[in-house]
């Protein structure tokens, strides 16, 4: 009689989809209003002048202009702004 024992189970059979996070427009680039500048988890970089923050912490341009990255504030945080 041909028999085959049951194969053992593995705990590694999962893989999540890529999230495509990161900087989408770099310093000095011209952007239009609504352009996504950074996709991130949490406020690693904070919104500055003319930059909005979505509910998933995506930073986007509120006006047309040039992207500028800088640090500042009491806690020396990273900011991104749009200069018109």
Swiss-Prot record:
Protein origin, superkingdom: Bacteria
GO molecular function: structural constituent of ribosome
InterPro entries, alphabetized: Ribosomal_bL27, Ribosomal_bL27_CS
Gene Ontology biological process terms, A to Z: translation
Keyword terms: Ribonucleoprotein, Ribosomal protein
Pfam family, one: Ribosomal_L27
Region named Disordered: 1-21
SUPFAM superfamilies per record: Ribosomal L27 protein-like
Gene Ontology CC entries for this record: cytosolic large ribosomal subunit
Entries under HAMAP family matching the protein: Ribosomal_bL27
Protein family membership: Belongs to the bacterial ribosomal protein bL27 family.
PANTHER family the UniProt entry points to: LARGE RIBOSOMAL SUBUNIT PROTEIN BL27M, RIBOSOMAL PROTEIN L27
Name of the protein: Large ribosomal subunit protein bL27
């Amino acid at each position: 009689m041909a028999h085959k024992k049951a194969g053992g189970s593995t705990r590694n059979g999962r893989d999540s989809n890529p999230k495509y996070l990161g900087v989408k427009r770099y310093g000095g680039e011209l952007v239009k209003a609504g352009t996504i500048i950074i996709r991130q988890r949490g406020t690693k970089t904070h919104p500055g002048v003319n930059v909005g923050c979505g509910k998933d912490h995506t930073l986007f341009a509120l006006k047309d202009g040039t992207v500028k990255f800088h640090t500042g504030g009491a806690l020396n945080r990273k900011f991104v702004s749009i200069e018109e």
